[in-house]
């Protein structure tokens, strides 16, 4: 897996589009996280790689954008918030959609997390994401979160509703 420092940040990718889209503006200017996709991002369009599309797999590095000096419970809360920013991407990828698909709407139906170790949101974490299923307007995203040293710190699952206007 490429080191996060070698990858382009979501902030850099979205900066040119910040004036055209509220979504792009959020990632370029307001996201509290430094997000770097190993698997090509679907922020700007659907995935053209059929292998990634078919599997729904995705790898993403993430950490706080800046230094956070708060109690452990807040580091965990920030990890939960951060995962929510990328959790549905594998579901959309598998469905052949992207975050920028015109008229798309999606919402979390259920979200669960399991903690195995303390989290330092100031350090890079690798989100190893997958989607076992995406069909009939619903999808299930699952992820394991690892430290840069390969320790599992958390696992999560999120079910979502996805709607795309009929063409």
Regions found by a protein language model. Name each.
Residues 1-167:
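Terminal targeting signals and extreme-terminal segments of soluble enzymes
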């Amino acid at each position: 897996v490429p080191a996060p420092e070698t990858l382009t940040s979501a902030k850099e990718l979205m900066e040119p589009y910040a004036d055209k889209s509220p979504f792009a503006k959020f990632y370029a200017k307001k996201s509290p996280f430094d997000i770097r996709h190993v698997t090509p991002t679907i922020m700007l369009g659907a995935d053209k790689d059929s292998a990634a599309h078919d599997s729904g797999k995705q790898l993403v590095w993430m950490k706080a954008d800046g230094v956070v000096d708060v109690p452990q419970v807040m580091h965990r809360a920030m990890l939960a918030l951060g995962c929510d920013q990328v959790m549905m991407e594998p579901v959309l990828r598998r469905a052949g959609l992207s975050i920028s698909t015109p008229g798309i709407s999606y919402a979390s139906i259920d979200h669960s997390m399991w903690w195995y170790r303390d989290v330092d949101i100031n350090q890079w974490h690798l989100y190893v994401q997958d989607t076992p299923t995406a069909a009939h307007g619903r999808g299930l995203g699952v992820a394991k979160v690892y430290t840069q040293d390969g320790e599992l710190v958390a696992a999560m699952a999120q079910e979502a509703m996805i709607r795309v206007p009929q063409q």
